[in-house]
């Protein structure tokens, strides 16, 4: 066959459907789970959809992506929301991002935050440090660092924050003392607004419905319950746990590289580097109570709470109740046992460790030369949202067809 696609999440489904739209049908998708959607799957819990992968929404910012996705699930089946997300920090509830909304805090806290921002390293000309924790202090000031960024990132990723690089944060604008002061005086937000400032969510379903429909559009081209165990680069062959072998001219892998128990034909140094790719696992847990808030989600940096974020389901999922939490797998021991619905996502977030860019550049370049292309959050080991992943998959199909190799 021309294309073997590993994984029926947003990346794999988009790539496959885009091929079909281009008139190419010589492909197959293999998926470990019994349903499509990857991290964006939904299940029914307490009478309404529960997104087992956590908070996944369709950002409005990519019209080309939305047009493509609406061809499977029309726009009239979606609600459009203005993002309402807050951070609970030191008894204050402030809008996200924190640096633009310090004006919402108690006056005494505003003063302390302003003082720390004024002497942040980036504002007084101190050289930029390399260590992650030092960089956070340098970029945001001690108050934002100690009250929010450091404890939150420890909860979301792990305690060893200095294993992370700073390359993924360097595009963040400096926190301007002048803008923050004006914000506090005028009582309104300044600065750049976060991603998902507006987003879509299905009216009648969970986010997973979109991917189910995309899978239905290529029915007969997906094999489920197929867990990949090995790959042979010499023959471009994939081996699954049941012993079946699949061979293709080009393999598109959207699954974690760590999932290959056996890798044949890859240089030892590249193969060895895969073990240095890190990730965090996240458990989602459902609670049936309605919260007295209009927010869509809430961030909790407090280290005494096990979870780092709450998704308030009844505020974005029509005719639902309750909320769910997101908790790093290393912290679930803090929770009291209960009978709530829970789901553990082994592969939730790729970690942006210091050496990751070097590892992935070499890995992806070499493997592409062998006809195996990494795509999406796990194929590229990048913390992409679903809309970005869809965009990348669409572009990859265009690139491969334009190259003339796959007419």
Residue spans of the language-model regions?
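N-terminal Rossmann-like FAD-binding beta1-loop-alpha1 element of flavoenzymes
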Residues: 2-29
């Amino acid at each position: 066959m021309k294309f073997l696609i590993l994984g029926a999440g947003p990346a794999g489904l988009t790539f496959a459907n885009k091929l079909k739209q281009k008139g190419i049908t010589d492909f197959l998708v293999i998926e470990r789970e019994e349903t499509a959607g990857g991290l964006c799957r939904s299940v029914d819990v307490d009478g309404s959809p529960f997104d087992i992968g956590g908070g996944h929404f369709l950002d409005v910012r990519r019209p080309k992506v939305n047009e493509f996705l609406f061809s499977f699930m029309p726009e009239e089946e979606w609600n459009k929301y203005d993002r309402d997300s807050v951070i609970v920090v030191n008894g204050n509830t402030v809008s996200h991002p924190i640096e633009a909304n310090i004006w919402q805090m108690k006056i005494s806290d505003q003063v302390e935050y302003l003082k720390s921002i004024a002497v942040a390293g980036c504002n007084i000309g101190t050289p930029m440090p390399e260590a992650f924790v030092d960089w956070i202090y340098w970029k945001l000031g001690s108050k934002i660092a100690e009250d929010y960024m450091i404890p939150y990132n420890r909860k979301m990723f792990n305690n060893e924050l200095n294993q992370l690089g700073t390359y993924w944060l360097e595009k963040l604008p400096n926190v301007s003392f002048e803008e923050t002061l004006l914000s506090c005086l005028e009582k309104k937000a300044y600065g750049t607004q976060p991603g998902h400032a507006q987003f879509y969510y299905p009216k009648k379903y969970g986010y997973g419905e979109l991917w189910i429909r995309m899978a239905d559009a290529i029915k007969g081209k997906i094999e489920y319950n197929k867990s990949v165990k090995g790959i042979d680069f010499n023959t471009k062959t994939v081996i699954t746990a049941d012993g079946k072998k699949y061979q293709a001219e080009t393999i598109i892998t959207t699954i974690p590289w760590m999932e290959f128990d056996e890798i044949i034909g890859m240089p030892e140094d590249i193969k060895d580097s895969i073990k240095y790719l890190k990730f965090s696992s996240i458990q989602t847990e459902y609670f049936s109570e309605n919260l007295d808030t209009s927010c869509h989600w809430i961030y909790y940096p407090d280290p005494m709470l096990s979870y780092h974020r709450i998704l308030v389901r009844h505020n974005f999922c029509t005719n639902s109740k309750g909320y769910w939490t997101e908790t790093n797998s290393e912290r679930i021991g803090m929770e009291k046992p209960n009978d709530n619905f829970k789901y553990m996502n082994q592969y939730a977030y790729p970690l942006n460790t210091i050496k990751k860019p070097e590892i992935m550049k070499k890995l992806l370049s070499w493997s592409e030369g062998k006809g195996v292309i990494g795509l999406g959050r796990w194929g590229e080991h990048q913390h992409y949202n679903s809309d970005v992943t869809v965009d990348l998959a669409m572009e990859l199909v265009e690139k491969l067809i334009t190259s003339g190799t796959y007419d």
